[in-house]
Swiss-Prot record:
Matches recorded under SUPFAM superfamilies: Ribulose-phoshate binding barrel (SSF51366)
Sample GO molecular function, one term: pyridoxal 5'-phosphate synthase (glutamine hydrolysing) activity
Family named by the database record: Belongs to the PdxS/SNZ family.
GO BP term, pick one: pyridoxine biosynthetic process
UniProt-annotated binding residues for D-ribose 5-phosphate: D23, G152, G250, G271, S272
Protein source organism: Methanocaldococcus jannaschii (strain ATCC 43067 / DSM 2661 / JAL-1 / JCM 10045 / NBRC 100440) (Methanococcus jannaschii)
Pathway membership, UniProt: Cofactor biosynthesis; pyridoxal 5'-phosphate biosynthesis
Name of the protein in question: Pyridoxal 5'-phosphate synthase subunit PdxS
């Protein structure tokens, strides 16, 4: 597939709409995912639950592992890079992955900025907890958004929170005047000024950033505001994000997947929920069926039977704020 333009990038994202993307750590798992009906796989060395348990620094996977998985399946293969780590993204583009996930599941590389994704030919997916994060990522060039949820927990509550926050923000945006929408764009743009403000404070200067001052990838604050405003106007007009929006972070059962689809998701990412369960192939098939038939409770009920033990979940209240992955990159 020829890659490059925003239209082509978004077109690839739409190709996986209504489907399930599954995390896989080896060729065998990738083949199970393909057999179960996954629309794509996410190739990585460890699923989020293992990344969470191991601690330390989580980085891009070995390119050799990703290439092995790419050679083993006929469906698209995605891979993760760290937030802001442009070089990891360039490596993934060089080996030919179909999409890059600039992911909070890995340790954040840049404390100030995300990758400027419009410089790349390969499409990107990024996580978002709310409309502000989604709009910033879309302006930077993301072709797909997903909820962050809380990866590796098997607990759907944070994914639900993020989808509801997104839906309510879009509903409120539609009731705003264009002038009010512009005010929202100015507020969302402030995140890009943090580096300049921090440097000025360190020099004993007022932490004020002028609108004609370049602050991110050569863009001035005014240009960023205008760019975010354009994205927000499109959201207001459409009543949804202008890109595909998937659910991710805590999906562990067919019912979880169906719930997220009912809340307006265009598809589902499943990380630890499949291969940390007792019967990965049957659970994977069931989640695919539930995602396609989310509005048919009888089918969701049928596919949920006799799947064996689901992954052991984690109560979100037992995770410290510092350990929550969702706060990486806003």
């Amino acid at each position: 597939m020829k890659k490059g333009t925003d239209l082509l990038k978004k077109g690839f994202a739409k190709m996986v709409k209504h489907g399930v993307v599954m995390d896989v750590t080896n060729v065998e798992q990738a083949q199970i995912a393909e057999e179960a009906g996954a629309v794509a796989v996410m190739a990585l060395e460890r699923v989020p639950a293992d990344i969470r348990a191991a601690g330390g620094v989580a980085r891009m996977s070995d390119p050799a592992l990703i290439e092995e998985i790419m050679d083993a399946v006929s469906i698209p293969v995605m891979a993760k890079c760290r937030i802001g780590h442009t070089t990891e993204a360039l490596v993934l583009e060089a080996i030919g992955v179909d999409m890059i996930d600039e992911s909070e599941v890995l340790t954040q590389a840049d404390p100030f900025f995300h990758i400027y994704k419009k410089k790349f030919n390969v499409p990107f997916v990024c996580g978002a907890r709310n409309l502000g994060e989604a709009v910033r990522r879309i302006w930077e060039g993301a072709a797909m958004i997903r909820t962050k949820g809380e990866a590796g927990t098997g607990n759907i509550v944070e994914a639900v929170r993020h989808m509801r926050l997104m839906n309510e923000a879009i509903a409120q945006l539609q009731r705003m005047t264009d002038e009010e929408v512009y005010g929202v764009a100015k507020f969302y743009a402030n995140r890009y000024a943090e580096l300049a403000k921090t440097v000025r404070e360190g020099m004993g200067l007022p932490a004020t950033v002028l609108e004609n001052e370049p602050i991110y990838e050569g863009f001035t604050l005014a240009e960023i505001i205008d760019g975010l405003y354009e994205v927000l106007l499109e959201v207001k007009k459409l009543g949804r994000l202008p890109v595909v929006n998937f659910a991710a972070g805590g999906v562990a059962t067919p019912a979880d997947a169906a719930l997220m689809m009912q809340l307006g998701s265009d598809g589902v990412f499943v990380g630890s929920g499949i291969f940390k369960s007792e019967n990965p192939l049957e659970r994977a098939r069931a989640i695919v069926e539930a995602t396609y038939n989310y509005d048919k409770p009888d089918i969701v009920a049928e596919v949920s039977k006799n799947l064996g033990e689901a992954m052991k979940g984690i109560d979100i209240t037992q995770i410290s704020e510092a350990e929550k992955m969702q706060y990486r990159g806003d």
